[in-house]
Amino acid sequence: MSMQDPIADMLTRIRNGQAASKVAVSMPSSKLKVAIAKVLKEEGYIAGYSVAGDVKPELEIELKYFQGKPVVELIQRVSRPGLRIYKRTTDLPKVMGGLGVAIVSTSKGVMTDRAARKASMGGEIICYVA
């Protein structure tokens, strides 16, 4: 059986892993998943990530906790295969009043909403993280 939305699966694995206080979660790798993991690492939401394997690469994400609580409070898919959500620079959302980030896929790659605003670029809103 094929997976319909691999990005939603990735976000769910992160959410469930933190709810179960896991050290790390692993999943099948793709370029987009690695780009999202890179943004999450830069923003401090995960401790790290690594890709292992040649034939079927696996992405392993090391989860991050602060005083025993998960760093990620909210991780929510926005644009999905059945309903893509695109926003212009001026319409990019501020997650939790600027405390969280929206991960945006632009023509220059995957970046946060702040970086997209700074570069005056819109794009597809992949997910919200706070």
Swiss-Prot record:
Q: Which InterPro entries match?
A: Ribosomal_uS8, Ribosomal_uS8_CS, Ribosomal_uS8_sf
Q: Which GO terms describe its molecular function?
A: rRNA binding; structural constituent of ribosome
Q: Which UniProt keywords apply?
A: Ribonucleoprotein, Ribosomal protein, RNA-binding, rRNA-binding
> What Pfam families does the record tag this protein with?
Ribosomal_S8 (PF00410)
Asked if the Swiss-Prot or TrEMBL record annotates the protein with the keyword Zinc-finger, the reply is no
One Gene Ontology term, aspect cellular component: ribosome
Q: Name one GO biological process term.
A: translation
The UniProt subunit note reads as follows:
Part of the 30S ribosomal subunit. Contacts proteins S5 and S12.
| Cited function | One of the primary rRNA binding proteins, it binds directly to 16S rRNA central domain where it helps coordinate assembly of the platform of the 30S subunit.
Family in the record: Belongs to the universal ribosomal protein uS8 family.
Q: What is this protein called?
A: Small ribosomal subunit protein uS8
Q: Which organism is it from?
A: Aeromonas salmonicida (strain A449)
